[in-house]
């Protein structure tokens, strides 16, 4: 007997976490069903050969005519992201509304009386607008690349100093095109919070800049989990303890998917601790220096000798930018990786940055181009300590045994609520 089909349809789904989220919540198998063209989406919807599906970009409006019944909330928003097949009749819902409302509430973002700037005019824009309007926002502004309709150009939006909350509803900064950003939060002196519906990476460039400004910043992962939990209620017809399930599943999966990036002085034990930590956390281990050697075909001392440090740092930045896009990794970095601020930002996008500290006299410096020991090593430590402090999110004192260091690293990671 053929199993009922549950899954997600969309144009491109390579970045999706929906399968692991749904299968964590419920007991059905959940499939990713990419439909690159409207013709394929049309055929899929006409066949109705599914029990229940979620819908993502670019089909949230496209599927509405195929629904026999559309929930009033979804009808008002003009977007459907959840469809349930009940005896051949398709029922359409929008759980993004509740998901975004959950995200805002979980981070203490209150729209009442606030001026809100929404980036983008796609399907999620209408959902976010509805939540902000229902939350009592004083003014809701929209910005887009074209400035069509009532939307401002992004450059025009930067001249609205009264903006208090920014919400990004565009795919800008989403995997694999990480590092992109439409506006600079520094331009908004009254800014209180930035929310980004992008969930991969955990922290987009927009959110990293918001954190630098000291304002509340939250990505879309909790929204993704919340809307999935609410969708599961429609899929199964069962009411769930959403108040308990959403934060628990969000926390568990963020820890499962997060990278742990390790920085510190040459010879402090980054690779040794990292390899053991990866095994304990069941994550892939990446030694960045080894990866650079693999990709360039040259060992690092030879690169320094033949091409110089500047060339090595370019290789390092390029390799790190690619590696850091992944998830569920422990990444052991070279000692000088923090000399480039862009590297530190890349490491922060998908998890904590662990600074391993070890006494100078205990550092292993053999075969390392820039750490020869003695006075030079002390000078190197003095130069880099402020950079390690700025780049790291947590500190590991590696003064004892490997087992003790790994135990402490696991404890720090599992206790980290800022992933």
Question: What feature does the model see in each segment?
Answer:
Residues 244-255, 276, 280, 326, ...:
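NTP-dependent small-molecule kinase module
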Residues 197-258, 398:
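Adenosine-phosphate binding glycine-rich loop
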């Amino acid at each position: 007997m053929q199993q009922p089909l549950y899954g997600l349809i969309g144009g491109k789904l390579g970045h999706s976490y929906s399968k692991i989220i749904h299968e964590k919540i419920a007991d059905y198998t959940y499939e990713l069903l990419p439909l690159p063209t409207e013709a394929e989406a049309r055929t899929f919807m006409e066949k109705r050969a599914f029990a229940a599906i979620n819908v993502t970009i670019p089909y949230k409006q496209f599927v509405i005519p195929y629904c026999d019944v559309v929930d009033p909330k979804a009808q008002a928003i003009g977007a459907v992201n959840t469809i349930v097949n009940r005896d051949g009749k398709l029922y359409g819902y929008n759980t993004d509304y509740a998901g975004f409302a959950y995200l805002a509430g979980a981070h203490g973002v209150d729209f009442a009386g606030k001026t809100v700037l929404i980036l983008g005019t796609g399907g999620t824009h209408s959902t976010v607008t509805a939540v902000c309007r229902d939350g009592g926002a004083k003014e809701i502004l929209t910005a887009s690349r074209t400035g069509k309709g009532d939307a401002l150009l992004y450059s025009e939006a930067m001249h609205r100093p009264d903006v208090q909350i920014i919400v990004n509803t565009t795919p800008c900064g989403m995997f694999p095109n990480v590092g992109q950003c439409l506006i600079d939060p520094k331009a908004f002196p009254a800014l209180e919070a930035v929310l980004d519906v992008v969930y991969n990476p955990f922290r987009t460039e927009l959110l990293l800049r918001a954190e630098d400004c000291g304002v509340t910043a939250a990505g879309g992962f909790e929204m993704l989990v919340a809307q999935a939990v609410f969708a599961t209620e429609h899929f199964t017809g069962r009411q769930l303890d959403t108040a308990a399930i959403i934060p628990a599943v969000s926390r568990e999966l963020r820890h499962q998917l997060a990278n742990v990036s390790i920085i510190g002085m040459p010879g402090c034990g980054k690779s040794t601790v990292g390899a053991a930590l990866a095994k304990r956390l069941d994550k892939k281990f990446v030694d960045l220096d080894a990866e650079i050697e693999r990709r360039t075909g040259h060992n690092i001392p030879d690169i320094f000798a033949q091409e110089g440090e500047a060339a090595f740092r370019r290789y390092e930045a390029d390799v790190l930018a690619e590696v850091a896009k992944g998830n569920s990794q422990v990444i052991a970095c070279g000692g000088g990786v923090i000399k480039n601020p862009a590297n530190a930002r890349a490491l922060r996008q998908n998890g904590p940055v662990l600074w391993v500290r070890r006494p100078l006299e205990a550092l292993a410096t053999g075969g390392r181009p820039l750490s020869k020991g003695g006075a030079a090593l002390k000078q190197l430590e003095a130069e880099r300590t402020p950079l390690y402090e700025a780049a790291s999110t947590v500190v590991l004192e590696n003064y004892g045994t490997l087992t003790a260091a790994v135990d402490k690293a696991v404890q720090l990671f599992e206790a980290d609520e800022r992933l």
